[in-house]
Amino acid sequence: MQNMNFKRKLPVPKEIKEQYPLTAALAQLKQDRDTMIADVFTGRSDKLILIIGPCSADREDAVLEYCDRLAGLQEKTADKLILIPRVYTNKPRTTGEGYKGLLHQPDPEKQSDMLEGVIAIRRLHTNVLANTGLSTADEMLYPDNYRYLSDLLAYVAVGARSVENQEHRLTASGIAVPVGMKNPTSGDISVMLNSILAAQHPHTFIYRGWEVDTTGNPLAHAILRGYVNRHGEAIPNYHFEELEHLYNAYAAKGLENIALIVDANHSNSAKKYREQPRICKEVLHSCRHSEHIRSMVKGFMVESYLEGGSQKIGEHIYGKSITDPCIGWADTEKLVLDIAELI
């Protein structure tokens, strides 16, 4: 294979977990959080979930400070909200160019180092849990890599570019925590619902060189993130009519645990990141006017960091996104407290 250079064999997930293990106390903390989060998706709890954090987790110190502040907000809103830090360590790139995340580049200004990356992502997710008591969310960009973090993640997202992929769907069917399926960039919600259907059913397939059986994931659910029309324009899909339509399509499909997370950024905001608080509040307004919508909406995804906006790699502004722009901490704190007040 002349076009592919096999540089070195990486440790398998079992080896990485043995080298960087979870303590029994952290494993129990994670399990307790898993139960609380599952109760939201099954309807046993009426709390809302906020999957919130930077577009990309680019440096450990800033992410840990952000999550420490988030833990303080969790204490203030514990009766209303469950906060799940968004610690995204691998990033899909539309053209294949640009920063691909901590997994690829533990140092954004250096070349890729996948061995160091595997260690870095496990260390970061572990440290967030150990330092703050908050278990984390990440995107499943590469299904084969999920096992490196399977004992740590409280929430898994499948992105708009991956949601039609069979390997993502089948792997999601073997995950024991909620997996959110985003609508594709075309906006076709039938694709998203078919992905949820596949993830909720058992399968047999090849995974990491093994023949595996899965039991299905009843916590697989929908994420609306807006879409792009044929003219390249961003079209939102969080308005009342779209939410009612999704509920009806969801119910007609006969899926378990009808549930939706609304992504307040991406095409829903046309990447105008300051719109995220307004979008969350509009969805909450819709919840007050429809019992169907209220029962379906389980929370939001918000892109947020210590500093608002974004920067180019190499500018070295601490706590500011090097990928998509995010709201800063003051706006984050206000949004979280406002949501808790409104529900």
Task: Mark where each language-model region is.
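Short acidic, Gly/Ser-rich segments with clustered Asp/Glu that frequently serve as metal-coordination loops
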Residues: 55-58, 257, 265-271
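Conserved phosphate/anionic-ligand binding catalytic regions in large, soluble enzymes, centered on
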Residues: 49-62, 324
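Conserved, mostly hydrophobic/aromatic
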Residues: 53, 262, 328
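Internal helix-turn-beta structural module
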Residues: 305-343
